[in-house]
Regions:
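Extended hydrophobic packing segments that form well-structured cores
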Residues: 1-35, 397-460
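Membrane-embedded hairpin module used as a gating/binding unit in multi-pass transport
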Residues: 223-308
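Short internal beta-strands
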Residues: 111-121, 334-339, 399-405
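Histidine-anchored nucleotide/phosphate-binding helix
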Residues: 88-108, 315-327
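Short glycine-rich or small-residue beta-strand-to-loop segments that form or flank ligand, phosphate
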Residues: 76-89, 114-121, 301-305
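An acidic, phosphate/nucleotide-engaging active-site surface
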Residues: 125-194
Length: 460
């Protein structure tokens, strides 16, 4: 009877385990964030650390308490901005209750609290997802005060950015006494670092604003601009434009940010204050905390997705992370583990992939860049085919395997992946079969397991 290693990864809200035969113990490595990144960068509890940071925020010459005293007007709400259902929201469920308690203690009326869900261009959350985002108590107690951003409703126009991006944001931001984004910073595959300023754009921006900003990521020859990469911010035209937009918005709306870094579900870093300064500070920490330097690429990488396994669009983050860890010689395989209960997750992504499904890979890539990735033609979702195709191009067609419950025929026909899970199989059985098959032909190869799409692997 075959024994299996302890390698727990996510399958939707479940944890699956026991799929790497123990005979490959010496060749298998579970990729975790560096050990130091698991140690909190503060003393005491999260609440104690947060309260200290509120007293001495970045970029402000007064405390949060004094800011509320100066800016709050009855009938003009304190608006907390939080992530949507596509994110784990470990930080939201901890920080938001503390902040609500805090503003109530500062004589903010309970009816003057609003919670704005920063959906960006994602679908609106279902009411059943509010608990996942906010926790049971807050989602129930403040149900009537929760607002979901809708990017297709006309926003408030505040001019153009220096790069010519029209700036339109959710009207609730302009009704606020103070806008309080609560974020967690992570590496991002084209914005460099997510969190902080991205809670404004794309978080609460209109579709028109996002579709003018995001095409700045593309390069006709390379697919993506060289500066648009995990951890890249200095020469990144997308994030540079967003920074500029936030700086302009700050002159019209009082914004006080709360940022965290979460490692393996626990908050290990907290800072507060000016949103742009928070972004710059978080970048210095997150790159160190999420970068793994390894001497050799793996033959096979198993990539769990955590909450990003909800659809193929979001699962692309885990695929991208695995791409950095796998061999690029046409012999390595990525096993992307994502149930995909919401299917593809983006209509534009779906349209572009179906339109180019029969084209050779390079022809399809160039066609998409020419016809769907200009400022005139770009729609949110059009960037994902470019990323998928450059990954497939580098690892080899047929080497991106998908373990999913979604329509295998469509995945195979249109999305440049090889769906390998049979309907009657469990994901564990599929992984056992795929790993055993690969290793029987490549017995000396390394196996990497990852369950964190925010990891940045560098092969030295």
């Amino acid at each position: 009877m075959t024994d299996y290693l302890d390698t727990p990864i996510s399958w939707g809200s479940e944890i699956i385990n026991g799929f790497v035969p123990s005979q490959y113990k010496d060749q298998t490595k579970f990729l975790h964030p560096p050990e130091f990144s698991k140690t909190p960068m503060f003393e005491g509890t999260v609440k104690e650390a947060l309260l200290r940071k509120l007293s001495n925020p970045l970029g402000y010459d007064l405390s949060f308490d004094k800011l509320v005293e100066q800016k709050y007007q009855k009938g003009k709400p304190i608006v907390f901005v939080v992530d949507d259902y596509t994110r784990p929201n470990n930080h939201t469920k901890v920080i938001l209750p503390i902040m609500i308690e805090k503003v109530l203690s500062l004589n903010v009326l309970k009816e003057d609290i609003r919670i704005l869900i920063a959906t960006g261009t994602h679908r609106l959350p279902k009411e059943s997802e509010f608990t996942k985002i906010l926790g049971e108590q807050i989602s129930e107690e403040y149900r009537s005060q929760i607002v979901s951003h809708d990017c297709d409703i006309e926003g408030v126009y505040v001019g153009e950015s220096d790069a010519g991006t029209p700036m339109e944001f959710d009207k609730l931001a302009f009704e606020a006494s103070i806008l309080v984004p609560i974020t967690d910073s992570e590496l991002h595959y084209f914005a460099g670092v997510a969190g902080t300023i991205k809670e404004i754009c794309p978080g609460i921006a209109t579709r028109n604003t996002v579709r003018q900003n995001h095409p700045k990521m593309f390069d006709r020859k390379l697919g993506f601009h060289p500066g648009c990469k995990l951890g890249g911010t200095e020469e990144n035209p997308v994030i540079t434009d967003i920074k500029n937009m936030v700086n302009i918005l700050k002159s019209k709306v009082t914004i006080f940010g709360i940022d965290t870094i979460v490692t393996e579900g626990k908050i290990v870093y907290i800072s507060t204050g000016d949103l742009v300064e928070l972004h710059d500070e978080a970048k210095q920490h997150i790159v160190k905390m999420r970068t793994l330097r390894l001497p050799k690429a793996a033959g096979i990488v198993v990539s769990g997705m955590q909450s990003w396994g909800i659809n193929l669009y979001q699962a692309g983050k885990g695929i991208h992370a695995a791409w950095n860890a796998v061999k690029h010689d046409g012999k390595g395989e990525i096993l992307a583990v994502a149930p995909l209960p919401d299917g593809i997750g983006n209509a534009n992504y779906e349209q572009v992939m179906k339109e180019t499904g029969d084209m050779p890979l390079q022809e399809a890539l160039e066609y998409i860049l020419d016809n769907y990735c200009t400022t005139e033609t770009f729609k949110i979702g059009n960037q994902k085919p470019v990323d998928t195709m450059r990954i497939v191009k580098m690892i080899g067609e047929g080497n991106l395997k998908m373990i999913s419950d979604w329509d295998a025929e469509q995945l195979r026909k249109y999305y440049r992946v090889d769906p390998i899970k049979n309907p009657e199989e469990s994901p564990v059985d599929t992984l056992r079969r795929a790993i055993s098959k690969y290793m029987s032909k490549n017995p000396d190869e390394l196996i990497y397991i990852m369950d964190d799409p925010g990891l940045y692997v560098i092969i030295e």
